[in-house]
């Protein structure tokens, strides 16, 4: 039991909820490789740091000798997961889904051991359900139970449309667990309802219900919303070391500690020590550098991490980037010149255009050459001349 308690303590690190912990302990006592499932719909071409929170936990199960299944939702991706959405997500074409799935397959191996990872596509069984099978599946849940889900409840109360296929989505994801006879399923906190549907469907199928483990959602570069490619507040795991370093350094000091909790492999005692050092006067930028280097070393190499730090020093610190630079947020895409004016970095749009022509404007350290550049959803550090800086989020 002591060994199980040790493993359990490691598995609980960074976890939001285990449903149920007693079930997990019973499964661990069986002393066999457990089937641990993580599903992802390839709705965008790249995996970002937000995805790695659950992937890191999957990797941990892998290290403890369990059977890891990474499920690519090539079927459910064409339906569209309504979790956390206040509008219907437009379904993707099969070509889009398969194209994105290829990059997922490549990028997960930056985190998971390819020799110990089983990749499956849920079209293998969902595509074979047919009309009769779909009717049997949907008979397991009522509309009333579906409306217990927060996002559906809010949309129904606000008279916002809910498409029938959105009700079906949790059942399809739950059926994945039946098809795989999963022991454990991982997901973000926004997936809790779907994971619990899987437990119910497994009971109906005569299987032991899976343990549902939810993990917190990583807040993106803007410091407000969950990391998402559509919001532009993300860092992709395939981005260059230089891009990664600059983006990590752009996050707020408060957000940095959340990222340490969810992304760092450092012992909790070491993270607590770093917090104490900051409270005692150490510059938070030093601690942010450590996080940036840890992530770059993980997804690239230690040599890349060192080189990215040096390039950052050459670009920014030698340009005396202020520690207390203003942070601003604007709604809707806008032209670069207007953004610089609204951010207080120039007096007028004509001055902004002139500074761009003279090579005096940089975004995340990269010189801008197009004065007519349109800035879409993103978070970046804008520099005008050698002394004017602002961290700007465009939503």
Swiss-Prot record:
> Which catalysed reactions does the entry list for this protein?
tRNA(Tyr) + L-tyrosine + ATP = L-tyrosyl-tRNA(Tyr) + AMP + diphosphate + H(+)
Function, as annotated, reads:
Catalyzes the attachment of tyrosine to tRNA(Tyr) in a two-step reaction: tyrosine is first activated by ATP to form Tyr-AMP and then transferred to the acceptor end of tRNA(Tyr).
Query: Where do we find the motif 'HIGH' region here?
Result: 42-51
Primary localization class, coarse: cytoplasm
Q: Which SUPFAM superfamilies match?
A: Alpha-L RNA-binding motif (SSF55174), Nucleotidylyl transferase (SSF52374)
Extract the GO molecular function terms from the UniProt entry.
Answer: ATP binding; RNA binding; tyrosine-tRNA ligase activity
Q: Which PROSITE patterns match?
A: AA_TRNA_LIGASE_I, S4
Under Enzyme Commission nomenclature, its number is 6.1.1.1
NCBIfam families membership: tyrS
Q: Gene behind this chain?
A: tyrS
Q: Which residues form the S4 RNA-binding domain?
A: 334-394
What organism does the record attribute this protein to? Pasteurella multocida (strain Pm70)
Known Gene3D superfamilies for this protein? HUPs, RNA-binding S4 domain, Tyrosyl-Transfer RNA Synthetase
List of residues binding ATP: 229
Which GO terms of type biological process are on file? tyrosyl-tRNA aminoacylation
- Which ranges belong to the motif 'KMSKS' region? 226-230
- State a single Pfam family of this protein: tRNA-synt_1b
PANTHER family, alphabetized: TYROSINE--TRNA LIGASE (PTHR11766:SF1), TYROSYL-TRNA SYNTHETASE (PTHR11766)
The record's subcellular location field reads: Cytoplasm
Output a single Gene Ontology CC term carried by this record. cytosol
Keyword set for this entry?
Aminoacyl-tRNA synthetase, ATP-binding, Cytoplasm, Ligase, Nucleotide-binding, Protein biosynthesis, RNA-binding
Tell me the protein family, please: Belongs to the class-I aminoacyl-tRNA synthetase family. TyrS type 2 subfamily.
Assembly and interaction partners: Homodimer.
Tell me the InterPro entries matching this sequence.
aa-tRNA-synth_I_CS, aa-tRNA-synth_Ic, Rossmann-like_a/b/a_fold, S4_RNA-bd, S4_RNA-bd_sf, Tyr-tRNA-ligase, Tyr-tRNA-ligase_bac-type, Tyr-tRNA-ligase_bac_2
Record's protein name: Tyrosine--tRNA ligase
- Per its UniProt entry, what is the enzyme's top EC class, as one word? ligase
